Amino acid sequence: SLVIGDRDSKGTNRFAHAEMLKRIIAGHFTWSPKMQELVKSNAIEAYCFPGGVIQALLREIGAGRPGLFTHVGLGSFVDPRNGGGKSNECTTDDLVELIEIDGETKLRYRPFKVDYAILRGTYADPRGNVSLEEEAIDMDSYSMALAAHNSGGKVFVQVRDV
């Protein structure tokens, strides 16, 4: 998630309830003050990863691959030597590990189960095919849907018309 919202009641703020979430993995929490409160109070587990890493990792999860291998994040807050992107004390699982490939140090962002993908589309047909033709941006909708589907999760799509 890139934590979309309006800093009030829209976007991911709608899901900012400890009873609804166990964990969030996001690029930032700027637009969701309610999510920030859950993270600060240790009500949910929270990871902060670079947005591009999240998008690429969702593609890897959707494809059933063993995670994302990259140099992105080395030496930063997502490096396991610097906290592994964990945003609070109740977040304990290691989702990032150091590995060596061909003599170079890389990070492996481990795959995880995606329980839900909540997306926006323009049109859908009765078979579940969705068109994004009039959406402003697709933000890797296909990768998110595939990651949820292949994790055994659910895909919800809001559309204008069927």
Where are these regions (language model features)?
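Conserved alpha/beta enzyme-core scaffold
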Residues: 1-162
